[in-house]
Amino acid sequence: MAVAAYPLIQGEEYKKMITAEDGLQGNMLVRSDRTPSSSNMFKYLNTSIQRCPLSARYVKLFAEKDSDIRYKLFFNKRRLNTKCIFTGLRSAEFALISMESAYHLGDKEGALRMLNDFRAHRISSYTAYTMATLPAVDANEYIKTDCTGAALTPLMQAILNERRKELYLEGDRFFELKRNGRPAIWSVYQGLKYTTEKFMYTFPLPPADLQVNPGLIQNPGYTEVIYN
């Protein structure tokens, strides 16, 4: 099991892993290779995302603030990113998968125990959650149901929140939204409102492919969007 072979790390060892721009560090299992051209793109992307503040919703998840090692490691006081983009697999992701799996298999106490262990590796002087002290479900969060369609419980939201905090800039957020209810999200750009509808979490088939093969059926929702 990845978590056993690559146990969770913390403190300076964790900082070294998160700030490393290349190579396998800490409990990384896989990391994308870097070529000269991809290195230039990496630097460009890291520079570009520093111009846009992080979501206030995301920053709000760090309730312990400075006690959480990620609070200063991932972004600064202006909510601008300071974390390196990472594409690969870390043992932390498997730990998060394990606690969510335990939850869905009915082992709520085991899931809580793993959640507390995970948070103890990220938050100094951590006080463990109990079922009674878990934060209430935040009705303002986008994700309102878990992957089974059931309404979020305090424990499941705590697990998903920890996943969101830990895997920031690791290509995880879109897929979390997709597998947990596909919530409609809107934003405003240049005075116009844009909404991500549920069907948009699955991309459309290219029109050229549909013309070549009349047997293909366009994914739901896109017939009106593309052709009307």
Task: Describe the predicted segments one by one.
Residues 1-39, 52, 56-228:
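Acidic/polar-rich alpha-helix caps and helix-coil junctions
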Residues 44, 48:
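Aromatic (Trp/Tyr) and acidic
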